[in-house]
């Protein structure tokens, strides 16, 4: 007989920024246990599912999540008691129905996701399987190429570049373990380069360095220098990936690049990126344009979509309806996958499958406010996503995911494949 949900208990814990978030523990009828904690973003898309916060200024500056915790411990607990744990789709549908709003505003996406993931972990334990195998039991798995966010700017750091993330991707590695080593060596090399320039080497929310560089181009230049000093070839062993988080730069129909003293139209921003792609070994640009600049996105995809991965994060917010439109209108060629943008495991998996079925890539991602939860590592492997974005190789909430992937690769042995540049299967 399949195990059913016996109990669920949620609590308020802290994320890596010292803000409260929701954690849930699930126990099944056969004694199996599952735990999950929910992350939180700093630059959030306006179309994301609602993260329920208390708004009580006397506690945690209004950022408490007691309402979401109470929703799990009362309404959700009552609804899922006795529910078959292995029916993930059914469970998530029940949560969506119970919430009854289009954006999960009643129960909170944080309450719903903690429940959804904790049940999945418990169900995997009940089957005596690691989570990745429980989600997709197959003969061979693809380990993800990591996007290491080694230089932070924008909303993830103060006094830094306009653009939020400058990343490196070790496509030339033969295994995930080697990719992790390469990325880490570049990270330490970057620290030395920055120190040599008398630059600040404190780290931002995601573990990347947050120096005060005069322009956005300087960030790319120092990373190229760091790659070479670590003994690697930019554009061969290691490529650059960017997340400018352009919605944060957009106001009144224009993009403002404060460090460059520039105000650009949508068409000019597209040309700006085309210029960068010509000049630097850039393989991926995430949120290169404002989340509702559909015409700009289509223009960018038309111009460079065959040679650069164009990832929609705030643009799609892991939402199938927005993704469907993006596919139909050829607005990009990739989607960023964040569990808490949509609020259930089933909807997240559906978004990955929809992207893959349209020959789009899907990049599984953390948030800037993370916990020690490693679900996304298992999800990336289970879905054979081929790419993961989970910060710098620094700060325990980031390295927890990388270390989980190391263990998975070791466990799989010859059944694990590291895709390298093949992760970008839709580029020419």
Swiss-Prot record:
One Gene Ontology term, aspect cellular component: extracellular region
Ligand binding ((2R)-2-phosphoglycerate): 164, 338, 367-368, 389
Gene3D superfamilies (UniProt xref): Enolase-like C-terminal domain, Enolase-like, N-terminal domain
Keywords for the protein's UniProt record, in alphabetical order: Cytoplasm, Glycolysis, Lyase, Magnesium, Metal-binding, Secreted
Main location: cytoplasm
Catalytic activity: (2R)-2-phosphoglycerate = phosphoenolpyruvate + H2O
InterPro entries named in the record: Enolase, Enolase-like_C_sf, Enolase-like_N, Enolase_C, Enolase_CS, Enolase_N
Free-text cofactor note: Binds a second Mg(2+) ion via substrate during catalysis.
Record-annotated active site: 206, 338
GO biological processes: glycolytic process
Biological or metabolic pathway of the protein: Carbohydrate degradation; glycolysis; pyruvate from D-glyceraldehyde 3-phosphate: step 4/5
E.C. numbers: 4.2.1.11
Family annotation (PANTHER family): ENOLASE
Family: Belongs to the enolase family.
UniProt cross-references to NCBIfam families, sorted A to Z: eno (TIGR01060)
Protein name: Enolase
Organism: Dehalococcoides mccartyi (strain ATCC BAA-2266 / KCTC 15142 / 195)
